[in-house]
Structures are given as C-alpha cells and as structure tokens.
C-alpha cells in the first residue's frame, strides 16, 4: 500500500532549500501560478510554497491556495520526479475556484514530469 502522507521531509523548510531551486529552475507556469523545479539527490520530491500577501490579500484565500496545493502534491508525490518544487502564486489566483486551481496544478505537475523525463 502506498503511503500518501505529507511528512516534514517532503517540505522545503529553509531559505537555503528555496535558493537551491531558484538558482537553476525548470519552469512550468500559467498566468496565475508558476512551479519551479530542480532535480535533487534525495530520491523523493519536496515542495515549498510562496503566497505573497501582495498578490492574495486575505488570509483565508492564501490558506485555501496553500491547502489545495499541498493536497495536490500529496496525492501525486509518488508519480513526481525527485525534484525540489517551489510554487509561486501570482495575481488573479484567488479568482479561481477550487476545481480550476486543482486542474491547473495537475497540468503543471504533468508538465514537470515530462520535462524531467526529457532531460
């Protein structure tokens, strides 16, 4: 049985972890969302989230976006390549409903999987 938990090891926690991804990222994005990824040597994917107050004013909207993003990652973690991902939220994402945001994330995860196989 495959574990679908989201332990601490699957998160980017320090600024050094984020900077590692920002140095040489593979990008997949839409006007509302960008996912940066960089291969790691750990053998499993990790995720970090950046949801700026500048782009999403209300805390409950920021929390909703982070919750849906973490859930999407948690469900796909075993099909994703061993990469560190940083999800960057841009203006306009709060207008998306939950279904549209989830579908957008799925599309971006698939794009990263294709890019990882190609490289």
UniProtKB/Swiss-Prot annotation:
GO cellular component: ribonuclease P complex
One biological process term in Gene Ontology: tRNA 5'-leader removal
UniProt entry keywords in alphabetical sequence: Endonuclease, Hydrolase, Nuclease, RNA-binding, tRNA processing
Membrane-spanning residues: none
Alphabetized GO MF terms: 3'-tRNA processing endoribonuclease activity; ribonuclease P activity; tRNA binding
Catalytic activities: Endonucleolytic cleavage of RNA, removing 5'-extranucleotides from tRNA precursor
InterPro entries per UniProt: Ribosomal_Su5_D2-typ_SF (IPR020568), Ribsml_uS5_D2-typ_fold_subgr (IPR014721), RNase_P (IPR000100), RNase_P_CS (IPR020539)
EC number(s) from the headed UniProt entry: 3.1.26.5
Keyword Membrane: no
Family per record: Belongs to the RnpA family.
Annotated NCBIfam families: rnpA
Complexes and interactors: Consists of a catalytic RNA component (M1 or rnpB) and a protein subunit.
Function, in words: RNaseP catalyzes the removal of the 5'-leader sequence from pre-tRNA to produce the mature 5'-terminus. It can also cleave other RNA substrates such as 4.5S RNA. The protein component plays an auxiliary but essential role in vivo by binding to the 5'-leader sequence and broadening the substrate specificity of the ribozyme.
Annotated protein name in UniProt: Ribonuclease P protein component
Organism: Edwardsiella ictaluri (strain 93-146)
């Amino acid at each position: 049985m495959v574990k679908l938990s989201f332990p601490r090891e699957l998160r980017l926690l320090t600024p050094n972890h984020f900077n590692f991804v920002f140095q040489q990222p593979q990008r997949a994005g839409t006007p509302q969302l960008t996912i940066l990824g960089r291969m790691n040597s750990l053998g499993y994917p990790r995720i970090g989230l950046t949801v700026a107050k500048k782009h999403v004013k209300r805390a409950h909207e920021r929390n909703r976006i982070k919750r849906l993003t973490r859930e999407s990652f948690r469900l796909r973690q075993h099909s994703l390549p061993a990469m560190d991902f940083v999800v960057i939220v841009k203006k306009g994402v709060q207008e998306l409903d939950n279904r549209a945001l989830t579908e957008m994330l799925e599309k971006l995860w698939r794009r990263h999987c294709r890019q990882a196989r190609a490289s």
